[in-house]
């Protein structure tokens, strides 16, 4: 991000494991294949590997090789506090995509910050950014200087609600997730890769969402479009939503369709979305 080029300079060269990772290790919640996302210099992975775990480092600056598999446990220690909101959103999406369906991620954030925004780094003498962070995930641990959130895929958490989008099936394949929005593949796809972007809070249609929810949906639409392009290599897309029964809406919980299109999937694609009314596409 152009506005935050020095976030990597906030990584500390430590001689021991970080407090959140040691806490989680002592609590026995670190399982299976582990990823330290935003690992800095890699001290936590060094500690966990010495304890018999298989822990991979990923850091855009210090360990830039992006992981090519999914993980049982993902750690993200003090990363979000030094990122701009749009960078935070990207991290949340990437971690959701790297986590196995039954896995858990732990986001540690600082609770002792006194100053917010840009400041001059006391060692490197360049502007670095910091902010307070609150997530709508389970608060797993908290003290005066640290809070650890536990994240699981939205599709894997039974929240007691009845709606198919408020409490989606654990069999639904998650594509990506943000704090307020998630994406899954459509159960009855129009084409290969047909995906849905769904706000977690139930609203009847797009125009009842808050501005923040609309922004989150737009971020997710762009992310899912990129994922589908890489995975299915379509020739085009139809993206949109139905509002009210007259427009074909059957589930009254806002959801945005992302429908990949392929050359030859219909005889004459001219007019695209105009074809919701037969005969109106060819004009």
Please report, for each region that a protein language model flagged, where it lies by residue.
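A conserved beta-strand element that flanks and buttresses the S-adenosyl-L-methionine
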Residues: 75
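A short His-aromatic
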Residues: 81-83
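Short functional linear motifs
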Residues: 88, 92, 211-214
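A short glycine-rich, Lys/Arg-flanked "PGG" loop and its adjoining helix->strand segment in the class I
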Residues: 89-101
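HIT superfamily nucleotide-processing domains
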Residues: 157-283
């Amino acid at each position: 991000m152009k506005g935050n080029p020095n976030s990597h300079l906030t990584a500390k060269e430590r001689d021991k494991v970080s407090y959140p990772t040691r806490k989680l290790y002592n609590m026995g919640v670190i399982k299976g294949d582990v990823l330290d996302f935003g690992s800095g210099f890699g001290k936590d992975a060094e500690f966990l590997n010495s304890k018999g775990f298989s822990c991979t480092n990923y850091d855009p600056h210090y360990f830039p090789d992006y992981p090519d598999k999914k993980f049982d446990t993902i750690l993200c220690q003090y990363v979000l506090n030094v990122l701009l909101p749009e960078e935070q959103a990207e991290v949340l999406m990437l971690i959701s995509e790297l986590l196995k369906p039954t896995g858990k991620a732990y986001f540690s954030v600082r609770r002792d910050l006194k100053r917010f925004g840009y400041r001059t780094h006391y060692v490197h003498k360049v502007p670095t950014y910091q902010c307070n962070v609150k997530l709508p995930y389970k608060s797993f641990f908290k003290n005066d200087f640290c809070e650890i959130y536990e994240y699981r895929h939205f599709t894997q958490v039974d929240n007691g609600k009845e709606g198919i989008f408020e409490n989606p099936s654990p069999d639904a394949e998650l594509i990506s997730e943000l704090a307020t929005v998630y994406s899954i593949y459509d159960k009855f796809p129009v084409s290969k890769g047909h995906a849905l972007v769904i706000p977690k809070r139930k609203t009847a249609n797009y125009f009842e969402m808050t501005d923040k929810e609309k922004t989150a949906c737009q971020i997710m639409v762009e992310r899912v479009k990129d994922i589908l392009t890489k995975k299915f290599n379509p020739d085009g897309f139809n993206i949109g939503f139905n509002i009210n029964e007259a427009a074909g809406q059957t589930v009254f919980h806002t959801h945005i369709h992302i429908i990949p299109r392929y050359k030859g999937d219909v005889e004459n694609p001219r007019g695209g979305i105009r074809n919701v009314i037969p005969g109106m596409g060819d004009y």
